[in-house]
């Protein structure tokens, strides 16, 4: 298969396998999604969904969140890991949202990326899942699968995002991002598959004999 043929096959396969793409992180509005995505760095969605009800019971909007201390926020979110850094980001971005945006989450990628603790991937998730704007958030998991499936030879998530956006129609980006995540968690895991055993890897590369190592910069 050519790269385009692999992309077309993957697109059709995942769309049939996962016709529904529920957002994994529990939230009620763009702000609570933003906070949940920030908490999900190096943490499972399951754990985040266990912690956010406790946090949002204290504060579920930037006005009340900015009235809490960083210490209180950190204590609640500690099970998510990186509590000092994440609590600082949540506290400071909440203050900025109150001061500069009247408590609203901006709908522009560049403005989201300028918020404390918000990187390109987090901003892309919010654009996609809160506002429905086409985006293709790429984390280390999607980066790994894209390499296993021969969709990119890039050594970083930035290059992989660029390559995936070129291969797939823009109207599929938001759903496909989630479908890849769902498939990776269920079948093409980091250690169990290694590019050899899941149905997609076997179909795309039937003659592959050795584990596919992820290129990293």
Label the model's feature ranges.
Residues 2-215:
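Catalytic cores of DNA base-excision repair glycosylases
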């Amino acid at each position: 298969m050519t790269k385009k043929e692999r992309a077309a096959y993957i697109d059709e396969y995942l769309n049939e396998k996962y016709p529904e793409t529920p957002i994994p992180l529990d939230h009620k509005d763009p702000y609570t999604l933003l906070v949940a995505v920030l908490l999900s760095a190096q943490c499972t969605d399951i754990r985040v969904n266990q912690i956010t009800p406790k946090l949002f019971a204290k504060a579920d909007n930037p006005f009340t969140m900015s009235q809490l201390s960083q210490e209180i926020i950190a204590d609640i979110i500690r099970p998510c890991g990186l509590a000092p850094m994440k609590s600082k980001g949540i506290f400071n971005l909440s203050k900025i949202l109150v001061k500069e945006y009247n408590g609203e989450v901006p709908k522009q990628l560049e403005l989201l990326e300028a918020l404390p603790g918000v990187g390109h991937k987090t901003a892309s998730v919010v654009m996609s899942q809160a506002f429905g704007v086409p985006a293709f958030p790429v984390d280390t998991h999607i980066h790994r699968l894209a390499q296993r499936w021969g969709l990119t030879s890039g050594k970083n998530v930035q290059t992989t995002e660029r390559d995936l956006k070129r291969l797939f129609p823009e109207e599929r980006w938001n759903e496909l991002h989630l479908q890849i995540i769902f498939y990776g968690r269920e079948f093409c895991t980091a250690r169990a598959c290694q590019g050899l055993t899941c149905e997609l890897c076997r179909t795309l590369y039937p003659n592959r004999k050795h584990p596919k190592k992820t290129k990293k910069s």
